[in-house]
From Swiss-Prot:
Species lineage: Bacteria, Pseudomonadati, Pseudomonadota, Betaproteobacteria, Burkholderiales
Sequence similarity: Belongs to the methyltransferase superfamily. UbiG/COQ3 family.
Name under which the protein is recorded: Ubiquinone biosynthesis O-methyltransferase
Organism: Burkholderia multivorans (strain ATCC 17616 / 249)
GO molecular function per UniProt: 2-polyprenyl-6-hydroxyphenol methylase activity; 3-demethylubiquinol 3-O-methyltransferase activity; polyprenyldihydroxybenzoate methyltransferase activity
The entry's keywords: Methyltransferase, S-adenosyl-L-methionine, Transferase, Ubiquinone biosynthesis
């Protein structure tokens, strides 16, 4: 059985044609992308590396990593999103190999293949995030890097990421997030400990509404990033 929620897949498929509009529903991803890309590159030094973007959607991060010199493959289960990603890759001239395949399936097919594996803003949308973490750990080479980002589960994250972002500021479409699926850092750390990965760094992401920008911080109450490495 595929580790995917059909409702979640449909939700993002319906918006696929808007993925590369920096002022539409995916504006937060466009605004967030430079911050997370720089953070990933600071650890993994992407140039010349083989990278896999799990849950790549329309390819915002995938193309950005390729633009820094990585050989990138992006996977997703939304064929609509992948169609948009392919088209944008042709328009931009930045080569990314996209495939509609589950993380667990590609992990069985290509274990220990990638220098870098990213799984950003995806874990909170799947029924079993632990299985995705395990798949990412299987996919990365010994000594390689795995990066996750997700949303913490607490009152503050509910107020800001759901009520604030979806209903008040309307930065995101209503229903984008299911609070019950948010993941505490301690829970994600538990998923990581069950694999061959170890956590190198956890950073928060803070949104500054006056400047309308994201920045790294030590506040992990809402959005947070986790850098992991597989033992060499």
């Amino acid at each position: 059985m595929t580790n995917a929620d059909p409702h979640e897949l449909q939700k993002f498929s319906d918006l696929a044609h808007r993925w590369w509009d920096p002022n539409a529903e995916f504006k937060p991803l466009h605004d967030l992308n430079p911050v997370r890309l720089a953070w990933i590159d600071s650890h993994a030094h992407l140039a010349g590396k083989r990278a896999l973007d799990v849950g790549c959607g329309g390819g915002i991060l995938s193309e950005s990593m390729a633009g820094l010199g990585a050989q990138v493959k992006g996977i997703d289960l939304s064929t609509e999103a992948l169609g948009v990603a392919d088209l944008h890759s042709l328009e931009s001239g930045i080569t990314v190999d996209y495939e509609a395949i589950a993380a667990e399936a590609i992990a069985a097919r290509e274990p220990g293949t990638y220098d870098v594996v990213t799984c950003m803003e995806m874990l909170e949308h799947v029924p079993s995030p632990a299985d995705i973490v395990a798949a990412c750990a299987t996919l990365v080479k010994p000594g390689g890097w795995v990066f996750f980002s997700t949303l913490n589960r607490n009152l503050k994250s509910y107020l800001f990421a759901v009520i604030g972002a979806e209903y008040i500021a309307q930065m995101l479409p209503k229903g984008t997030h299911d609070y019950a699926r948010f993941i505490r850092p301690s829970e994600l750390a538990g998923f990581v400990r069950a694999t061959d990965l170890h956590i190198v760094e956890i950073k928060g992401i803070t949104y500054h509404p006056l400047g309308k920008r994201f920045a790294l911080s030590n506040d992990t109450d809402i959005n947070y990033l986790v850098a992991c490495r597989r033992a060499a």
